[in-house]
């Protein structure tokens, strides 16, 4: 982990994937759990703020920028010169939304079309009736399946609930009963297990980690 003091009010911290791993955290963990985001950022602050100039300030704010190898974090303490500066916002939904947007943009050269498609179709997609839900005991099992899964013709969502990962795959009516789907599900059950848990339940009670193209994103970032 690298730290650079930009000025008396701002610290820049580079957190690579090894640093995240050492803390038992992945980029995926930071996508939806706001309390975990806050705890993680303040743990970084405690580590780099050795003279306690920032920890004792009630108006500390954070900016996060995903990088190819982790995160770039800007920690600022607000004083009268920073009051009203919209560039420095508190920890909120923008953190996880920014990371999600970065993952999607990096994954596709047609990023504008993809973002539009996701925004327009996600609410409708979640109402799809032909869902197959598979549960995985570990994220490593899910990665192993994603590496060999055929995902071009399906939408897939990733949820976490009670420390288990749930992969929800939406199949169209035209291919639901095809041999290809049966073969893919049989393959999925070698790494995970079928479950009666519904997408509606996961949407209400679980934490959604990835939308629309979960299998493709997992394969891309964890190959």
Curated annotation (Swiss-Prot):
Cysteine pairings via disulfide bonds: none
InterPro entries found in the cross-reference section: MecA_C_sf (IPR038471), Neg-reg_MecA (IPR008681)
One of the record's GO molecular function terms: protein-macromolecule adaptor activity
Taxonomy, superkingdom: Bacteria
Short name of any one Pfam family annotated for the protein: MecA
HAMAP family noted in UniProt: MecA
Function: Enables the recognition and targeting of unfolded and aggregated proteins to the ClpC protease or to other proteins involved in proteolysis.
Family affiliation: Belongs to the MecA family.
Record text on subunit structure and interactions: Homodimer.
Domain remark text: The N-terminal domain probably binds unfolded/aggregated proteins; the C-terminal domain interacts with ClpC.
Protein's UniProt name: Adapter protein MecA
Native organism: Limosilactobacillus reuteri (strain DSM 20016) (Lactobacillus reuteri)
């Amino acid at each position: 982990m690298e730290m650079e003091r930009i000025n008396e009010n701002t610290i820049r911290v580079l957190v690579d994937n090894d640093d995240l791993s050492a803390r038992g955290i992945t980029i995926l963990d930071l996508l939806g759990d706001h309390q975990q985001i806050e705890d993680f950022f303040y743990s970084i602050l405690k580590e780099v703020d050795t003279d306690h100039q920032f920890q004792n300030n009630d108006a500390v704010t954070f900016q996060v920028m995903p990088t190819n190898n982790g995160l770039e974090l800007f920690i600022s303490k607000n004083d009268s010169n920073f009051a009203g500066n919209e560039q420095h916002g508190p920890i909120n939904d923008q953190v996880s939304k920014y990371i999600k947007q970065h993952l999607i943009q990096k994954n596709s050269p047609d990023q504008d079309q993809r973002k539009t498609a996701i925004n327009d179709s996600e609410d409708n997609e979640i109402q799809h009736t032909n869902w197959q839900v598979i549960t995985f005991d570990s994220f490593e099992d899910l990665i192993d399946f994603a590496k060999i899964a055929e995902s071009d013709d399906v939408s897939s969502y990733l949820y976490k609930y009670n420390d288990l990962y749930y992969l929800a795959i939406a199949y169209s009516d035209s291919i639901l009963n095809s041999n290809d789907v049966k073969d893919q599900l049989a393959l999925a059950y070698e790494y995970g297990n079928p479950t009666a848990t519904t997408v509606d339940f996961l949407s209400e009670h679980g934490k959604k980690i990835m939308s629309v193209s979960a299998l493709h994103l997992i394969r891309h970032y964890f190959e």
